[in-house]
Amino acid sequence: MWTFSEHKDWTYLEQRFDWIKRMNEVQQDPRYHAEGNVAIHTQMVLAALKVEPAFQVLSEDDQEILWAAALLHDVEKYSTTVFETDGSITSNGHARKGAQFARQLLYINEPAPFVIREQIVGLVRHHGLPIWLFEKPDPLKALVKASMEVNTQWLALLARADMLGRVCDDQEEMLYRIDCFEAFCQENDCWGKARAFTSGHAQMYYMQHDDAYLDYVPFDEPAFEVILMSGLPGAGKDTFIKKHYPDWLVISLDHMRVERGISPTDKTGNGQVIQEAKEQARVYLRKQESFIWNATNTTSQMRMQLIDLFTTYKAKVKITYVEVPYENLHGQNKSRDARVPAAVLDRLTHKLEIPALWEAHELSYHVS
C-alpha cells in the first residue's frame, strides 16, 4: 500500500516538510476563515475528513489519497495570498498552483504511483468546484471535464471536509451547494466516475461546441488519425514510436532541430521549426493521411492548439502520453541525440500538465 506518510502527527509533518511548516505564516480572510491561518485550517479539514461516514467506508488506499489531497489542498496559498486595498485577503489561483506543486512533489520528491498521483493532483486542482460550479459559464461542461480528471464522489467529500474545517457565517449555504453538486453529478451520470460518451467523436463534438447536447451522436466519423505524442524529453517517445508505429509518417520537432542545428533554447529557431512542422502537417491533413506529431506537448495549451488544427481537417486525434520515473529521466535525456539542457528539462517538468481524457478522441498512458 502506498502511503504519503506513515506518521500523521502534525508536529512530525511540520518537522519533515518545510511546505507544511510555512502554512503557519499564511493568513486568511477572517470572514471565511475565522479559525486562523492555513495550518490551523488544514488540521481542521483533516480532522473533519476522518469522521465523515463516506470517508470511513473507503479502503485504506483510497483514504490515503484523500488524506494527502486534504493535506495539500491549500499548499499554494503561500504563494498566492494577497492583502487587497479594501482589507480583504485573497488567494486567487491557489488551486491551479497547488496542483502543480502536488504533481512535482509526488513525481520528484515523494514518488507516488501515476494513478494515485494524478488523482491527488485532480482533487487539489478542483477542490473548490463543488462550491463554485454553478457560477461558471457552462456548469455542465465544467462538471463533465472534471469528472474525466477526478473522482467526483471524492471531490465532494473533500469539499465537505474543507467547509466543515473552517469557521464562517456561510457554512450552511456552502454545504447546500455541495449537496447540489452531488445531485447534479448523479443527474448527469458522472457521480464517482467519468462521464461516458458513445464514441470519441461524440465526446470531441461536445467539447468543441458551446451549444452541443450532451448525448448528441454526430453522423460522420473521422476518416484518418493523428497521434499526438506527449511526454518530457527523455521519456521514451521515439522508442515508443519505433516499437508500436514503425511504418507511420512522423513529424518530429527534435529531428528537425537536429537537422538544422537549432538548440532547444533558441526561441527564434524553435519558432521556425514549429511553423515548418505545421506546414508539413497541413500537407498530410489535406490528403487525409494519418501521421504522428512527435514533440513534448507537456501543457494543455500546447496540445489544444495542435488538436484544433488537426480537427479542423476532421482528423481523429489520439494523445499518447509517455512517462518514466524522474530518477531515470535525466539519464535517458543525456543519451539522446537531441538532448535538452538539464535546466530546461527541469523547467518543463515543473510546468508539466498530464493530458486529460476530454482533450482528444482517445488517450493512452504509457508509464514505466
Which stretches of residues belong to each language-model region?
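Active-site metal-coordination segments of metallo-dependent hydrolases
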Residues: 30-44, 86-100, 273, 296-299
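N-terminal pre-Walker A segment at the start of P-loop NTPase domains
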Residues: 186-221
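Glycine-rich phosphate-binding P-loop
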Residues: 225-245
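Conserved GTP-binding G-domain of TRAFAC-class P-loop NTPases and closely related GTPase folds
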Residues: 227, 247, 326-368
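Conserved phosphate-donor/acceptor-positioning beta-strand/loop module used by diverse small-molecule
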Residues: 313-332
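Conserved substrate/cofactor phosphate-moiety recognition/catalytic segment
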Residues: 238-291, 326-330
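Divalent metal-dependent catalytic cores for phosphoryl transfer on phosphate-bearing substrates
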Residues: 51-177
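Acidic/His-rich, divalent-metal-binding segments that scaffold phosphate/diphosphate chemistry
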Residues: 1-83
